[in-house]
Amino acid sequence: MGLFKIILVCFIAGIGAGLGTGFAGLSAASVVGPLLSTFLDVSPYQAIGVGLISDVLASSISAYTYHKSGNLDIKNSLPLLLSVLVMTITGSVVASYVPAKAMGSTMQIMLIILGLRFILVPIKTTKAQMNAVSKKEMLIKSVLGGIVVGFICGFVGAGGGMMLLFVLTSLLGYQMHMAVGTSVFIMAFTALTGGISHIAFGGIPDFTVLMFCCLFTLLWAQIASKIANKVDTRTLNIVVGIVLILTGIVVLVFNNL
């Protein structure tokens, strides 16, 4: 494959993946995977691996940006993180035995529905309301939510970003900025675990493709996360909703080409 084509596809994938990560806490793999498979003939399993490795850097820099703005809850998210990590490995192993065609089918419809939800019924929870939730209740919900999210992360290869955002806002009652910041923090670890597992079972991907995807995704994630931390909750709800809907539509189209 030509270098120009690789750079162009990775740049476009990086824009979508980076904006999705920085604004909405989405996994880079949900965008990178279908684009690499469609235009660069990378196997779906390896394409997801590239997306997850790109996700590690993008999520890490985004999490740092949210942390600087006080929008990252590390302590209370640890039970969720640990349960997600355990199930990510399980999901990734199971996915290695699934036909490539099945791997191309993700959760685009759910992305669109969740996007509409944030626009039509925005999250209005404040940090004070979030902190008033019982620690025991949050622990139980975190572990249960983590089991589901982790398996999805490993199996679908989407980093569980969409499900993490849903669990944090709807199940655990997080404030919107805090939910996105905590989501990308957890995703940095889940994507690393999932990425290593995908490479271990699916082989090492093309280094040039991996390098450019990581570079462009990191760049756009940094830009998006800085903007996200400067807008109010209502605006962030709308932005997140739009990003989710567009991502769902774009990935749905490419998966059916």
Regions found by a protein language model. Give the residues of each.
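Membrane-interface alpha-helices at helix entry/exit sites of multi-pass transporters
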Residues: 42-50, 75-76, 173-184
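Transmembrane helix-bundle signature of multi-pass membrane transporters/permeases
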Residues: 18, 48-56, 85, 180-191, ...
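A small-residue-rich subset of transmembrane alpha-helices
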Residues: 54, 182-198, 208-221
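Hydrophobic, membrane-facing alpha-helical anchors
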Residues: 1-6, 10, 53-64, 112, ...
